Amino acid sequence: MILHLSDLHFGTEKPECMWAIQQFCQQHQIEAVVASGDLTQRARYAQFFACKQFLESLKRPYIVVPGNHDIPLYHLWNRVFSPFTRYKLFFDNLENVLETEHFYLVGVNSIRRRYHTRGHISLEQIQRVDEQLKAAPKNKLKLVIAHQPFYTPPNDPHGVKDCPVQGRLALEQWSKHGLNGLLHGHLHVPAAYDLNQIYQLGAAHPVWDIHAGTATSYRLHDNLPNSFNVIDHHMDVRHYFFNAVSQQFEQKP
């Protein structure tokens, strides 16, 4: 199974949540860790360093993608001309692939310097990921990681304004070649939606849009505690929430 973290927002982290995640990894057979963006609060060197140290402490293979908080906000020169310099100093490539016993994980950079919060998936990215999905082992679950969700329900205050430009086009193309799910953060609210049913994609299996809450930050939304997702090799998605009394992450009943 994989541990799906998001919106760590180092610079606003809670040590008790970090410790509880470390304990969880020690106690469970985690194949890999996914961190779906917003690793930092303000893209500072110290924040990237702290995030890197934390992910390394989990002692599991991991894959990360940038979020909108991972490029400079106030330093306009850096935002325009070198938005990912600090990110790449600690995490190298913006887009990676990680293969485990049961999963084939593809990272996609949906962050653009011209947008404050909204994502964007280019035609080149759509084609590249499509080729990767076609080449992926058929016996593994194929998951694509991007920071912004590809779907928000009609009553969501963010609406479609934060969903990536060309996200629907990407979804329709990737679902033709075995996509099982998309992993996101951004909204700080855990959820899972079957896009095969919502959009009538015609896939032979569910295509999940899986949202993670914030795992370690005090920047909580909707009065929800810190949380993360666990996804097993049957594509069963479980949400775990931080219990302030037990100081552990516990599965939602």
Label every PLM stretch briefly.
Residues 138-155:
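Short acidic, glycine-rich surface-loop motifs adjacent to enzyme active sites
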Residues 159-234:
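Conserved beta-sheet core of the metallophosphoesterase superfamily
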Residues 11-13, 41-46, 68-76, 113-117, ...:
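Active-site environment of divalent metal-dependent phosphoester hydrolases
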Residues 19, 47-51, 122-127, 160-169:
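Charged helix-capping and loop-helix junction motifs
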Residues 4-6, 33-38, 62-68, 109, ...:
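Active-site neighborhood of phospho(di)ester-bond hydrolases with catalytic His/Asp-centered motifs
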Residues 49-128, 136, 173-175, 206, ...:
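Extended active-site neighborhood of metal-dependent phosphoesterases/phosphodiesterases
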Residues 232-253:
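A short C-terminal boundary segment appended to hydrolase-like catalytic domains
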Residues 1-57, 73-74:
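N-terminal active-site segment of His-dependent metallophosphoesterases
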